[in-house]
Each structure stands twice: as structure tokens, then as C-alpha cells.
């Protein structure tokens, strides 16, 4: 496992999202003081989750077909999506945000 530097806390305001170019791309969200990272591709269609709509209770709605996902677990919360999004651990250290990724990705 390795830590991928993304940005500083100041660069991602509360309610913000950022696409992290990686293989696969990762969506990073800042919700209510917490940071969450999930696969950036909707499990139902070819849409960028980082362009989705951040909602209450740390959920995000896909911009294409309105599928909704829990950012904490990646679980698909409503149709048309049924498969979860992969989640990634996020570490904040000295004001910097890192995503923990597998070196095998």
C-alpha cells in the first residue's frame, strides 16, 4: 500500500469534489469535515462520480442516471445501480490529503 498525495485541505472546501487521475480514476469528496474516496466511475454507467451531486448523510448522486451511493461504504443506495463503488482510505496529515492505494492497481 502507498499513499497518493492529492491536495491540501485548503484546496478542497467542504462540499467539494475532485477527480484524481489514477488507474482507475478516484473521486475525492469533502463532506462535513470528513474526506471520502471512491472509484470515479459509476458502477451502473460510464459517468464520473466526481461530477455528481453531494447529498446529505455523505451520499453522492450519479450525474447520469441518478443512482446514489454511500461515500462511507460505497454501497449503491438506489436503482439503477446495484453494485457498490470501491472505497479508498483517506489520510489527512499536516494539512495534506492522501489516498491509500494498492501498489498493484
From Swiss-Prot:
Pathway: Aromatic compound metabolism; 3-phenylpropanoate degradation. Its cofactor is [2Fe-2S] cluster. It holds the Pfam family Rieske. This dioxygenase system consists of four proteins: the two subunits of the hydroxylase component (HcaE and HcaF), a ferredoxin (HcaC) and a ferredoxin reductase (HcaD). PANTHER family: 3-PHENYLPROPIONATE_CINNAMIC ACID DIOXYGENASE FERREDOXIN SUBUNIT, FERREDOXIN-RELATED. One of its GO terms (biological process) is 3-phenylpropionate catabolic process. It comes from the Bacteria. The gene is hcaC. Keywords: 2Fe-2S, Aromatic hydrocarbons catabolism, Electron transport, Iron, Iron-sulfur, Metal-binding, Transport. Binds 1 [2Fe-2S] cluster per subunit. [2Fe-2S] cluster binds at residues 42, 44, 62, 65. This is 3-phenylpropionate/cinnamic acid dioxygenase ferredoxin subunit. It comes from Photorhabdus laumondii subsp. laumondii (strain DSM 15139 / CIP 105565 / TT01) (Photorhabdus luminescens subsp. laumondii). Part of the multicomponent 3-phenylpropionate dioxygenase, that converts 3-phenylpropionic acid (PP) and cinnamic acid (CI) into 3-phenylpropionate-dihydrodiol (PP-dihydrodiol) and cinnamic acid-dihydrodiol (CI-dihydrodiol), respectively. This protein seems to be a 2Fe-2S ferredoxin. Belongs to the bacterial ring-hydroxylating dioxygenase ferredoxin component family. GO terms for molecular function: 2 iron, 2 sulfur cluster binding; 3-phenylpropionate dioxygenase activity; metal ion binding.
Amino acid at each position: 500500500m502507498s499513499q497518493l498525495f492529492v491536495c491540501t485541505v485548503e484546496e478542497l472546501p467542504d462540499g467539494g469534489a475532485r477527480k484524481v487521475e489514477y488507474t482507475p480514476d478516484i473521486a475525492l469528496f469533502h463532506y462535513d469535515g470528513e474526506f471520502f474516496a471512491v472509484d470515479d466511475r459509476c458502477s451502473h454507467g460510464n459517468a464520473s462520480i466526481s461530477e455528481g451531486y453531494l447529498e446529505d448523510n455523505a451520499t453522492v448522486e450519479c450525474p447520469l442516471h441518478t443512482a446514489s451511493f454511500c461515500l462511507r461504504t460505497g454501497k449503491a443506495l438506489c436503482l439503477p445501480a446495484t453494485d457498490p463503488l470501491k472505497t479508498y482510505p483517506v489520510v489527512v496529515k499536516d494539512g495534506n490529503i492522501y489516498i491509500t492505494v494498492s501498489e498493484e492497481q
